[in-house]
Design a protein with these regions (language model features):
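Metalloprotease/metallohydrolase-associated module, dominated by Zn2+-dependent proteases
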Residues: 100-172
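Active-site oxyanion-binding pockets that recognize sulfate/phosphate
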Residues: 19, 72, 76, 127
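Active-site scaffold of zinc-dependent metalloenzymes
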Residues: 42-77, 86-93
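Auxiliary, metal-adjacent structural segments of Zn-dependent hydrolase domains
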Residues: 2-61
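N-terminal low-structure segments adjacent to metalloprotease catalytic domains
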Residues: 1-2, 91
């Protein structure tokens, strides 16, 4: 039986050092993915690394999460992105399955309709950040990382931070 070092060496020979680092980073993120999926009571999703313009993205139909390489290699940023995308997956499943006990269901539907009409991308505008599905995802990301891992996160904009705090106070 081959040792981990031998297997790692073969992997590096076949795919390169950079791909090895990415795979190691993804392996380290598996427990986080599992934990947030269990918390939200949604299926666990595969996570891959692709060259995308935004930090992360979720593919609802295909059911997987994409991280940009630099995000995947930064554990805190990867954790934030994974939790954020899982919250979007939860929102999507609430709408798809008509989970009426979710108090924000109607707002989720409106947010997804906006994304369909305007494209599912972070364009850096106030319109994007003011969508309830984005406020909810950023607030959940902040709440979950603090409650489960003791990690405090902040948004660069102090006013947006206050909005997230108020949202957490009202909904979590």
């Amino acid at each position: 039986m081959k040792s981990k070092e031998q297997i790692d060496k073969k992997f590096i020979e076949a795919f390169g050092e950079e791909q090895f680092k990415i795979q190691e980073a993804l392996n380290a993120l598996d427990p986080i993915s599992k934990e947030v999926a269990e918390y939200l009571e949604v299926p666990e999703l595969p996570i891959v690394v692709e060259p995308i313009p935004e930090d992360s993205r979720i593919y609802y139909k295909e059911e997987f999460i994409v991280l940009r390489k630099d995000i995947a290699l930064n554990k805190l940023e990867a954790m934030k992105s994974i939790v954020h995308e899982y919250r979007h997956y939860y929102q999507f499943l609430c709408i798809k399955n008509a989970k009426y006990e979710e108090p924000l269901l109607e707002h989720y539907a409106e947010g997804f309709q906006y994304m369909i009409e305007h494209g599912n991308k972070n364009d850096g505008t106030d319109d994007y950040y003011s969508l309830i599905i984005e406020i909810d995802a950023f607030a959940f990301q902040r709440y979950f990382l603090k409650e489960v891992y003791g990690i405090e996160t902040h948004y660069p904009n102090e006013e947006y931070d206050k909005i997230l705090d108020k949202f957490i106070e009202n909904f979590y």
